[in-house]
């Protein structure tokens, strides 16, 4: 069994046996990610996909407090969301494209909070295995952090339209057991058994025909490709509110979060 380790600053990447393990390594920030983090994640996923020694990819977060708390609110603004090649919007779309087009199974190993962008990653991967102490949910409307297009609408293919809207629009928190019942995760186990459960899933997948697995994964992806392609032709935020970042609404959301107070969004209704 060989082990390969690649050097990154915000993530850890290790290939051991036929499993590539990608770890968001910002535990002091609950594994919240910056645009740079997303770039590294994307590079790692593509690397795993191109590696003939890799059969399964496992995505996780460092520590036992969070899989990922989503985008780092302290660096989120108009420039980081919509400006140029380093925008959150563009970079996240590239990451989810990597998850889809890496035709090897991608498993999200969730231990702790999977919130906001961390929740996105948990439900767009092929499988999600969670510890029983994990918590799932969205955060965008609560902190005025915009998300749009396929990233949002894909959730209805996982849990159904009504529940997807509830998750996205109400920002409630859901236990691992609730997530299992709704189809957000595939399995829930005690935290002490999480690595063994993930390893079991990896072993099962590695025993199967890699080409047939690729065909199945691409078939699922192609079934919704027309929706994704249509939504990626334009920016929905610019249609709904082209002056969103200049309006002060996003600033109020992020400042309220940093100040640990309830935001006042009344002026923007």
Question: Where does each model-flagged region fall?
Answer:
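Well-ordered beta-strand positions
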Residues: 127, 166, 170-172, 178, ...
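C-terminal long alpha-helix characteristic of the crotonase
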Residues: 27, 129-134, 185-232, 265-269
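Terminal low-complexity tails and localization/encapsulation signals of metabolic enzymes
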Residues: 1-8, 255-269
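Glycine- (often His-adjacent) and acidic-residue-rich active-site loop
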Residues: 5, 61-98, 114, 142-144, ...
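CoA-thioester-processing core
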Residues: 95-101, 109, 115-169, 182, ...
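Conserved CoA-thioester-binding segment of acyl-CoA-metabolizing enzymes
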Residues: 1-60, 97
């Amino acid at each position: 069994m060989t082990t390969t380790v690649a050097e990154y600053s915000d993530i850890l990447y290790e290939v051991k046996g036929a499993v590539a393990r990608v770890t968001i390594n910002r535990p002091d920030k609950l594994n919240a990610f910056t645009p740079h983090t997303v770039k590294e994640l994307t590079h790692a996923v593509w690397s795993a996909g191109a590696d003939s020694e890799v059969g399964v990819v496992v995505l996780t977060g460092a520590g036992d407090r969070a899989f990922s708390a989503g985008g780092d609110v302290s660096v989120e603004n108009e420039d980081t969301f919509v400006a140029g090649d380093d925008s959150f919007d563009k970079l996240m779309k590239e990451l989810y494209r990597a998850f889809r087009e890496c035709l090897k199974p991608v498993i999200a190993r969730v231990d702790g909070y999977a919130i906001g962008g961390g929740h996105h990653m948990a439900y767009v991967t092929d499988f999600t295995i969670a510890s029983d102490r994990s918590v799932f949910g969205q955060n965008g409307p609560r902190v005025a952090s915009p998300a749009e297009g396929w990233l949002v609408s894909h959730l209805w293919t996982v849990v159904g339209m009504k529940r997807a809207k509830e998750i996205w629009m109400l920002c409630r928190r859901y236990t691992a057991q609730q997530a299992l019942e709704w189809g957000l995760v595939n399995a829930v186990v005690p935290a002490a058994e999480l690595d063994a459960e993930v390893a079991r899933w990896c072993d099962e997948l590695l025993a199967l025909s890699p080409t047939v697995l690729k065909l199945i994964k691409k078939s699922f992806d192609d079934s919704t490709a027309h929706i994704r392609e249509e939504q990626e032709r334009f920016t929905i935020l610019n249609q709904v509110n082209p002056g969103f970042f200049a309006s002060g609404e996003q600033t109020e959301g992020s400042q309220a979060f940093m100040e640990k107070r309830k935001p006042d969004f009344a002026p923007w209704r």
